[in-house]
Amino acid sequence: MTPKELNNKANEIRQDIIKMLLTAGSGHSAGPLGMADVFTALYFEILNHDPKNPEWEGRDRLFLSNGHICPVRYAAMAHAGYFPIDELTTLRKLGSRLQGHPERERLPGIETTSGPLGSGLAQAAGYAYAARMDQKNFRVYCITSDAEHQEGNHWEAVNFAAKYNLSNLTAFVDRNNIQIDGYTEDVMPLEPLKAKYEAFNWSVIEVDGHNIEAIIDAANMAKAIHENPTVIICRTIPGKGVEFMENLPEWHGKPPNVGEAIEALADLRTLSGKIKSEHE
């Protein structure tokens, strides 16, 4: 896909997120909107995968640690062809395959059921370690939130991955600076995050999380690193594309009402598929 097509796709995904949350009447708005560009880059350029054969042995594995942002993953998967886009309207419904946190047993293409925050990187690191033992060539990716870095078990996984030089593992950090209790630096400061990962012997790449080309370039750089695992710190704006949601912790864990959804969709449609990044 061309850069313009990728930006248009990310905008379509953002619009679907708003519609899904409105229909569900519950869920998280800020994180999914902020990560639409990363998931577009993953599902349409970075991942080696086959939507028609989601259990293909050679596929790259994508773990979503902060499962509450799953609307963006579901929307990206639907647009990639894993299931009909119309099914997105079943988000959080009783019996739906699209639960409020992804469940592997329900939806093909999900590698693991998302559990407590902070546990996803441990799952991904274990999978990457097993892949190396089995001499498999696929890569393992893990999406984590910044607030998950307040969990001790996350750093145990960081240490484990470095000890075993898991160069087949790439983590993406959604560095959006908010969490349910407020701003991360007020709740429990995370900076200097880059230096912390470097101290654990990870390769660190920092990118504008709304520049799809930069995200793709960073993932390609990670593939070329063979000495240690890589983390890509994505500086994102929570609620990106919807002006009244951007950078506000109160939108971490609530959906829009009808009026807010209409305003949000108007904002997104005005963008015509173009989310401005710091590089422009």
What are these regions (language model features)?
Residues 212-280:
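Glycine/aspartate-rich loop-and-adjacent alpha/beta segment that forms the canonical ThDP
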Residues 1-5:
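Non-catalytic, mobile gating and regulatory segments of ester bond hydrolases
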